Amino acid sequence: MENTVKYRKFILPIVVGLIIWALTPFKPDALNDQAWYMFAIFVATIIACITQPMTIGAVSIIGFTIMVLVGIMDTKSAVEGFGNSSIWLIAMAFFISRGFVKTGLGRRIALQFVKLFGKKTLGLAYSLVGVDLILAPATPSNTARAGGIMFPIIKSLSESFGSTPKDGTERKMGAFLIFTEFQGNLITAAMFLTAMAGNPIAQSLAEKTAHVHITWMNWFVAAIVPGLISLIVVPFIIYKMYPPTVKETPNAKKWATEQLEEMGKISLAEKFMIGIFFVALILWITGSFINIDATLTAFIALSLLLLTGVLNWKDILNETGAWNTLVWFSVLVLMADQLNKLGFIPWLSKLIAHSLGGFSWPIVLVLLILFFFYSHYLFASATAHVSAMYAALLGVAVAAGAPPLFSALMLGFFGNLLASTTHYSSGPAPILYASGYVSQKRWWLMNLVLGIVYFIIWIGLGSLWMKLIGMM
């Protein structure tokens, strides 16, 4: 029997959880015992998600069990938490994204972009980011997008130009492309409700915490201008900060053409995938007008993929990331919801809002975003960070007088952009960093600069855009 449990990493979450629990007699008068117990369990669970003594799914199940065992919720009500439609949207979209990988359509699209725009290294970077942008609406796992589709293309392309860490030639091309893809992946994740697993969580928490209704369309409309500006500006800044030594890539077109010839003509499965993707995209855009929500759209798309044979039930069962996400996100969202229902989040929001009482709401919101962003150095998952802090921060912003929809969307966008911090910040980070093309020091320093760029574009220009379209 292989024991993969790292028992020492349980020490910190258990100690912190027990200390908070033991402080129950000294809790604020505004909170009841149940709210304080829930807070202790939630904090312990989040810390365990960070220290990772077990996989995050296993940790969440233990937290769920303790929550029910101590009587905070009864079993029936707790199990109903696994029926959250926003989380099922994530799972369904995981399955849809598997179709891009299985059919080879994602790879074909990437190669076509390289063939069309790959004459220069900078153009190559823009073309790869463009592929990420196209795939993002139907790929809620930005890890799958970066690791399953984009990274193999970048690695093969870099090696074909003699750029490998092993030979000390990573600066030729690979380092620039790897880091640009990382940043582009975060930007596209922020642009669509269905482009990163944490976004539907933010949508759900916004509804429960501040009664804000976020749709696929209003998220996209709000994000499109700062998103497109970021996709144009950020690769160019990286090009200037960390320039590749190979700036012309005349052979890229030939390489891509050879790879496409090797793939052969577009298959029937790929044609089905294209058609179903467009059906899903149209329904996500128009769903709020025809009463088809984003989750139902994802179910429709998956049903069509199964009916056409693009995916089979074994594919669904083997998509372990979806089932894992369904379990641990359900538990964390359930816990956050209980904190809200038991009065802890409203109390905390009022407390922080009172302490920031001398400031206007724009200053409060900016301070909250800065805190949200830089506290991510303590997290190894953007989605876990959103699950842990989004509701409380949104509550504080609204209590300070900030427009609810504007605040919910801005915090939602930065729930993605905050991954521009470390090499362990989110799923794509360790995949791309582990390739060896970019050193840890360089990774952190460039992220430090780009964090400021994101503040200027998304808070500055993004706020002006959202005011112009009436979302502020």
Regions found by a protein language model. Give the residues of each.
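Juxtamembrane and boundary regions of transmembrane helices in multi-pass small-molecule transporters
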Residues: 1-24, 142-146, 161-264, 413-472
